[in-house]
Swiss-Prot record:
GO terms for molecular function: structural constituent of ribosome. The gene is rplQ. This is Large ribosomal subunit protein bL17. The lineage of its organism: Bacteria, Bacillati, Bacillota, Bacilli, Lactobacillales. It holds the Pfam family Ribosomal_L17. One of its GO terms (cellular component) is cytosolic large ribosomal subunit. Part of the 50S ribosomal subunit. Contacts protein L32.
Length: 127
């Protein structure tokens, strides 16, 4: 399987992809370079597929990759409900794409970045 090195060591590349994938899950869209967006698209689609499987093994695989970040905090009277990025994948995104067989994200190219002229893109979930 081929992948882009992104001018980083393997640990730095894995950390970058984990951070960008978690940000995409939390926010629904991110703006990054085109090469990074193409790599994050692969990992984001894998996380949605794991969410659709929904079993314990898939949940543990997704938990090993997605950062443990708070996605939402809601208050119901005395109770405080905290939702993590992992819970968002399994409770919101997986049911949303239950009848879709892939292609959960889209990449839209934007203007080059000012300063170094890097090709930029917006990566977002398909509605």
């Amino acid at each position: 399987m081929s992948y882009r090195k992104l001018q980083r060591t393997s640990s730095q590349r894995r950390a970058l992809l984990r951070d960008l994938t978690t940000s995409l899950i939390l926010n629904g869209r991110i703006e990054t370079t085109e090469a990074r967006a193409k790599e994050v698209r692969k990992t984001a689609d894998q996380m949605i597929t794991l969410g659709k499987q929904g079993d314990l093994h898939a949940r543990r695989q997704a938990a090993a990759f997605i950062r443990n970040v708070v996605a939402d905090v809601k208050e119901d009277g005395d109770d405080v409900v905290v939702t993590s990025a992992l819970q968002k994948v399994f409770s919101e995104l997986a049911p949303k794409y239950a009848d879709r067989k892939g292609g959960y994200t889209r990449i839209m190219k934007t203007m080059p970045r000012r300063g170094d002229g890097a090709a930029m893109a917006i990566l977002e979930f398909v509605d």
